[in-house]
Amino acid sequence: FGFNIIDVRDVASLHRIALEHPDAIGQRLIAANGFIWFREIAALLTNAYPDRKVPLREMPNWLTRFVSVFIRELGTILKDLDVAAQLDNSPAKKLGWQPRTPREAILSGAKRLIDLGIV
């Protein structure tokens, strides 16, 4: 399982562009900058923070489907198992939006959580 990554600062930046840029009127701008699998996120965090315990195991899809019978909330992700959704953010980039890479967003978010003592 995975999802499209975006740094919250880039979401704010895109909101500002959407409010200020006349070419943004009437457009739907996607605030996402690349799909990444959870196992890739885990590997990235493990390399960046080797002293931290980062879960590396992934629940197999068959088990996720089985458990979703008992935990209905899991049902919402079943259609997305093994799907790498590619979203088109080119309209936003044409307006001058320059989001951070997924790697930068993940590492920055992790550092912030550590600095705040949350993890």
Model regions and ranges:
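Mid/C-terminal beta-alpha module of Rossmann-like enzyme folds, strongest
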Residues: 13-75, 102, 107-119
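Mobile gating loops/cap/lid regions near enzyme active sites that modulate substrate access
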Residues: 8-11
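Conserved C-terminal active-site "lid" loop/helix of NAD(P)H-dependent oxidoreductases
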Residues: 67-97
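A conserved pocket-lining segment of Rossmann-fold NAD(P)-dependent short-chain dehydrogenase/reductase
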Residues: 1-6
